[in-house]
Amino acid sequence: MSATHLKQLCEETYTKLKKISMEVERFLNQVTLAGLVSASGDPEEFETYYRKYLSDLRHLLVYCENAYERLGVSLRRARFHEEFAEEVLYQVYHTCINNFYYPKGEVYEEDGRLAYTGQDCIIFRKQVIPELQQLTLSLSRVFEPMRNDLQYYETDYIAKKQMQQEKTRA
């Protein structure tokens, strides 16, 4: 990948992660667990579900903030360091993107078949309040193109790093 293309990818990813972080932080600052549970009806059924959901969102926020800060460092350097930038993009894929699509609390899941039809591909385990549904679906519309752009970092980047290590050993 050329340095120009890599830098452009870092800039685009930085912008998207910053947008995601702002949206998630705004939501988390406005809601409480008690408020979500009371808006949903049955407290016993929804308290654990929303607790997991909020925990996943807080983790996602931390991962995205860390990643966009590291991308910012990479982009501000006087000389663009390609290896560092690739490492950060790898971490974006494996922390931010994977944690969005595979949340630890399993509060929703992705149905990849729906993505090809142009429909929202997130399926919620329980009916959530409209604001949370809107946030999650909005995030998926930002994460989906980012995931496609960073697909290289799922497996090919690791293979490249392993080949480089083997060359240095030989």
What are these regions (language model features)?
Residues 1-170:
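Long, low-complexity or tandemly repetitive, helically biased scaffold regions used
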